[in-house]
Swiss-Prot record:
One of its GO terms (cellular component) is microtubule. Its main location: cytoplasm. Keywords: Cell cycle, Cell division, Cytoplasm, Cytoskeleton, Microtubule, Mitosis. The gene is msd5. GO terms for biological process: cell division; mitotic spindle assembly; mitotic spindle-templated microtubule nucleation. This is Augmin complex subunit msd5. Component of the augmin complex composed of dgt2, dgt3, dgt4, dgt5, dgt6, msd1, msd5 and wac. The complex interacts directly or indirectly with microtubules and is required for centrosome-independent generation of spindle microtubules. The keyword Transmembrane helix does not apply. It is found in: Cytoplasm, Cytoskeleton, Spindle. As part of the augmin complex, plays a role in centrosome-independent generation of spindle microtubules. The complex is required for mitotic spindle assembly through its involvement in localizing gamma-tubulin to spindle microtubules. The keyword Cell division applies.
Amino acid sequence: METNVDFSSISSKLYRKYAQHVRNLKDVCVSKTVMKPGAFFDSLQQMMEEEAAATTPPRDLSSVADYAELFKTLEEYPANLQKMPKKRELQRTNSTLLRGADESVAMGINTSNVSLSLTRLEEQRSAVDVYNDFKGFQRKLAKIYDEAAALDTTESIYKQKLTQLHGFAQQLEKLMPTGGESPPDAFTSEQQEKLLTIAANMEQLNYLRSNSLQLPNPNEILATGSLAARLEMFVEVLTYTLLQVSSYNMAMI
């Protein structure tokens, strides 16, 4: 009676007990041999001859009955092979396969069409939602167009301002002296002192205005000759003069 030996249990016990000597066990149990090329090819030739002798029929075919038996064996195909069908049968088989393929494709198309038609209506967007999205898109486009137009308007305004500044700079260049001699002072020393006095009086007047102090009536100014009232009238004259000069400069530009 043959005894079944579980080599996996034996190997697991050996690996568990002699884990550190696994390499030594392999070297002892496995014999390694290296053959020379000549000896390898001689042994290969011998193995091929032995294989050919095993598959070659033991006797020669000498009679018609032996040949008939051989052809009968060739006509019988094993289970994993199929006999090659004739040409007419092959054409009939191909046409059947093509017809079946066309029917399967048509069936798949019909199935997809049916699945599309069975899609729930609530999963599809309504016409109202599409129209609302379109109107929102139109509003965004109009807003972007207005912003672009505003930018163009601002750019044109800045261009006009730059043109005016360029003209003003040209006018200033014309007014600047070109000779090497230093130009005379615009005001004499006495005039400068008067202007400084006027500026100090204007500061006092601004202080009076900022503190809401009451000034006398112009009729009282003429009657009494108050200094503060006279300064008030002088400031009004200067303001009018400055406005006229500014208007003239703007007209020149």
